Design a protein with these regions (language model features):
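A generic transmembrane alpha-helix motif of multi-pass inner-membrane proteins
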Residues: 208, 435-458, 480-510
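Select transmembrane alpha-helical segments in multipass membrane proteins
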Residues: 71-82, 107-110, 149-162, 210-212, ...
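Membrane-interface "cap" regions at the ends of multi-pass membrane proteins
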Residues: 61-93, 120-127, 131-144, 148-155, ...
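Loop-to-transmembrane helix boundary motifs in multi-pass membrane proteins
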Residues: 77-79, 85, 208-209, 319-325, ...
């Protein structure tokens, strides 16, 4: 005899509907008996007052459990948070010194082309996986391809974010330390900035203290959740970053001789147009959009199906490119105006820029402002890394967020201690000829990020059903089908080839 069962729940303003997945619950055939008395033990998240009535089965009935899946409170909230994740030190620190050592304008042009043609499609593929799966980086793959091993791509991304944040927080600590230096008088005209940087990174107590402070700020924001924590912080930090950048760019462009720096950034010297520059620009494009480590999958999982992920992706890309351009317009005109070389390498913002700013009127204040915006960019990236790890552990149970955030944040700090000490008392300890900091950096940027990006491309374009991808990715978007097909074909052919080239080059084979 066919029987049916109905279970009704009333949902409070802040209490979502809870439906238990993969649990068989015995339900009494006596419909006059309240379910709270029928079940010997209620499911953990089902409250008795939420259950109204039912028509029951004499046997077990399968009930799905839908947990409290939070989301962005607005479209701009997602865009600002994802842009903050992508911008980070890649745009403000890595882009200027990489452009400076690779010819400036030629590198910037190649970086622009590769970002649009290759990196953006992969970022959109991560958006597709996260939004369609609707869960954390691991479970989104499990939802889209149940019973397969593709979830290991998500697990790899989560592990990458954990490791990445462990040494990224070390650099974040340096930046915070320099902000303090700016206000305590350590940075002044005539100071030995190379010696100051060496002391900053090699002092164990100082390095660990500022690393801990950086992680404390990150944990404090992420424990607040998506809308009340990460989104709210980015609503202030990202506009602040752009305002400070524009102000500093205007000041830099008014310096005598500044146009030489502008020409370096915007007027191509085609002698730099060579294979090495192209591969480096391609690698920077992937690094710049924060792809390959599942951060964008996690952020997109909080995105509604009615939101245009293509428009959001393009907005995020152009914001990232704008910050890279502004970073160049702040740094290169000032560097050329005071006779410094643009090809200074990673020490550019810690060694060269202090000397440059000290030659300006109110240089100490301007440098403090610059380091403050670097702090903003560093933190917004750190939020996404920690959230990727947290989301995979709480699995949409927001009640666990605070506890897990504190525990995981502490674990990340502890794992990061060897990286912090690798510039000082542990500088002689090396694995495969690399310090702990350099080893983690190489593992993430040269191995995991390319493999992650390649896996996402193959999964979206080759493993998933083509029509399903086009339907789900195009949901909420006005993008023509022809553009969707172009995006999918780019993921099929162009993106994998480009990623493999970057991967081989990063391994030192090319």
């Amino acid at each position: 005899m066919q029987q049916t069962a109905k279970l009704y729940s009333f949902i409070g303003k802040k209490h979502p509907e809870f439906i238990l997945q993969n649990k068989k619950i015995p339900i009494s055939p006596d419909i006059t008996q309240p379910i709270g008395k029928v079940l010997q033990r209620l499911p953990r998240l089902v409250l008795p007052h939420q259950v109204l009535c039912y028509n029951a089965l004499p046997s077990h009935f399968l009930i799905n459990f839908m947990s409290n899946h939070t989301s962005w409170s607005s479209k701009i909230g997602f865009v600002l948070a994802a842009a903050g994740s992508a911008i980070g030190l890649g745009a403000i620190w890595k882009f200027p010194y990489t452009a400076g050592t690779n010819g400036g304008a030629v590198f910037f042009l190649l970086f622009l082309i590769f970002t649009i043609l290759v990196a953006l499609p992969v970022q959109l593929a991560e958006f597709y996986i996260g939004r369609t799966g609707g869960k954390n980086a691991v479970d989104s793959f499990r939802v889209l391809r149940p019973g397969t091993q593709w979830l290991w791509v998500g697990r790899m991304g989560v592990a990458a974010c954990f490791i990445l944040l462990s040494f990224y927080s070390v650099v974040g600590g340096w930046v915070l330390n320099y902000v303090v230096h700016s206000f305590t008088g350590a940075i002044h005209a005539g100071a030995d900035f190379e010696a100051l940087f060496g002391t900053t990174i090699s002092n164990p107590a100082g390095s660990l203290s500022y690393q801990a402070l950086f992680m404390l700020i990150t944990v404090w924001v992420v424990k607040g959740g998506i809308s009340d924590g990460i989104e709210k912080a980015n609503r202030y930090l990202m506009p602040g970053l752009f305002i400070l950048f524009i102000a500093l760019a205007i000041r830099s462009l008014t310096l005598p001789g500044a146009m030489e720096g502008v020409s370096f950034l915007l007027k191509p010297n085609w002698s730099y147009f060579k294979a090495d520059t192209m591969i480096t620009a391609l690698g920077q494009a992937f690094f710049a959009l924060s792809i390959g480590v599942s951060a964008m999958i996690t952020y997109a999982s909080y995105l509604g199906k009615d939101q245009d992920m293509f428009r959001s992706g393009h907005t995020i890309m152009w914001m990232n490119l704008l910050v890279s351009l502004l970073a160049g317009l702040v740094i290169f005109p000032a560097v050329f105006a005071f006779g410094f070389e643009p090809s200074q390498g990673p020490g550019l913002i810690f060694i060269v820029l202090p000397a440059v700013f000290m030659k300006m009127p109110f240089g100490t204040v301007l440098f403090a402002v610059f380091m403050l915006l670097v702090v903003f960019a560093t933190l917004t990236s750190a939020f996404s890394m920690l959230e990727t790890v947290i989301a995979s552990t709480i699995r949409q149970d927001e009640r666990k967020r605070k506890k897990h955030t504190w525990l995981i944040g502490t674990a990340i700090f502890i794992v990061g201690i060897p990286s912090a000490l690798s510039f000082g008392i542990w500088s002689e300890f090396k694995v495969f000829g690399k310090t702990i900091f350099d080893l983690w950096d190489y593992l993430i940027s040269a191995v995991i990020m390319p493999i992650g990006a390649l896996s996402v491309s193959i999964f979206t374009a080759w493993i998933q059903d083509k029509q399903s991808v086009l339907k789900d990715a195009g949901s909420g978007s006005t993008v023509p089908r022809a553009v969707l097909l172009l995006w999918l074909n780019t993921l099929r052919y162009l993106a994998p080839i480009a990623i493999i080239i970057v991967f081989i080059n990063s391994l030192g084979i090319l």
